[in-house]
């Protein structure tokens, strides 16, 4: 008998929210001052995927690194 073990992996956007807080930037600012998509913010809140271009845009707006936007979490 072979047991299959599923390894859960996920990308967390928690660093993004921490970076926004440190920079004093709100979702309102991103949407209405930077033209960022409210739908994309919704997707991030619900742990859904976003594009590399979106990550690039957020890094530019927030003047930060990719690790300040996303974190890879592996559930062992």
Protein language model annotation of sequence segments:
Residues 1-29:
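A short, Lys/Arg-rich alpha-helix, primarily the initiator
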Residues 17, 28, 42, 56, ...:
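Residues within the helices of the helix-turn-helix
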Residues 21, 35, 46, 74:
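Residue-level detection of the helix-turn-helix DNA-binding "recognition helix"
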Residues 21, 32, 60:
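Alpha-helical residues within the helix-turn-helix
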Residues 48-60:
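Short, basic-rich loop-to-helix N-cap that marks the start of a DNA-contacting helix
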Residues 63-76:
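Short C-terminal boundary/hinge segments that cap the last helix of small helical domains
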């Amino acid at each position: 008998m072979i047991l299959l073990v599923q390894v859960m992996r996920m990308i967390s956007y928690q660093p993004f929210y921490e970076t926004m807080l440190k920079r004093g930037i709100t979702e309102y600012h991103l949407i209405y001052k930077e033209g960022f998509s409210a739908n994309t913010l919704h997707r991030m809140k619900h742990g859904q995927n976003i594009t590399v271009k979106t990550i690039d845009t957020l890094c530019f707006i927030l003047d930060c690194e990719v690790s300040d936007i996303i974190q890879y979490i592996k559930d062992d």
